[in-house]
Amino acid sequence: GSPGMLKFNIIASGISFVEGDPVRFSVDGQLIFLGWVFTKTRDRYAVIDVICYDQLRYLKAQASYCFVGRTAREIIREIAQDLQLTAGDLEDTGWPIPSLIMEEKSCLDIISTALQKTLLATGKLYTFFDDGGALSLREVGSMIATGVVGERSLLTNYSYKTDIDHETYNSIKLARPNEETGRADVFQVTDSGNISRWGLLQLYQSVDTALNDAQVESMARSMLEYHNRRFRTLKVQALGLVGLRAGQMLMLDIPKLGDISLHRLCLLERVSHTFQNDLHTMDFDVQELGE
């Protein structure tokens, strides 16, 4: 995840504000953003460009943590308390992470790692975000946006890409340190068919010593299932939907999208809104579309 950001400019005419001041942005009475001023840039014509961030910005603080048998929700609560941040509705992720040890990492990276481990173990994907000044965690399946974007509704342009360049792997090797032998126990799964098609694309990672053989083997199979494919990415430009945010599911209706026809709910990874001269537009990136 990344902090929510608000950028705007104003003419300096008797307005006085400083870094750290709170900022609220609402549209038609709906609170869209609550954050704080971090950057001010002024030009010779007294126009001030302002950049504000929400509460997730403070999670860039670096720290070291050792968690054993704690759920992602419990980890978020402890970090929020340590940083004196406000926690709101945090959904119970249910699965205790056997071990999570991270040194001198940003708290946002620590939380992201906890959620990634939860995804690999349970298959459940969660969205972590600031909801009007309160840290929130929800399963993506419960965050369905209203509205449709497509050829007959709001869509103005899109960019669709297919590749095997960045996230595609047809061989997974997981290494678990073994203190008794002084060597790593290596678990490997491959797809010989796709190795013949694309060449050997291998991912190698170390895993926690607390995981048993069955858990490591299951993790390797899950990783191969996810990475062993061609990836499809979609970027969309459209007229704006107020309140749409990253982490929500949105219905997209784009027939004849290259090699596929798209009509389904899609997860939004990044959303950017622009309000200018009474016109509201948005750009968003869709999570990889799958085979």
Report each predicted region and the residues it spans.
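Charged- and aromatic-enriched interaction segments used to assemble
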Residues: 44-163
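Short, acidic/charged, Gly/Pro-enriched secondary-structure junctions
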Residues: 9-42, 71-82, 112, 239-265, ...
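Acidic, small/polar-enriched beta strand-loop surface segments
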Residues: 14-15, 112, 116, 123-277, ...
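Glycine- and charge-enriched low-complexity intrinsically disordered segments
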Residues: 68, 283-291
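Assembly/oligomerization scaffold segments
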Residues: 1-59, 149-161, 233
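Well-ordered beta-strand positions in beta-sheet-rich domains
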Residues: 31-36, 49, 64, 186, ...
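Non-catalytic surface loops within mature trypsin-like serine protease
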Residues: 12, 54-56, 89, 178, ...
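Residues in well-ordered beta-strands of folded domains
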Residues: 9, 24-26, 38, 51-53, ...
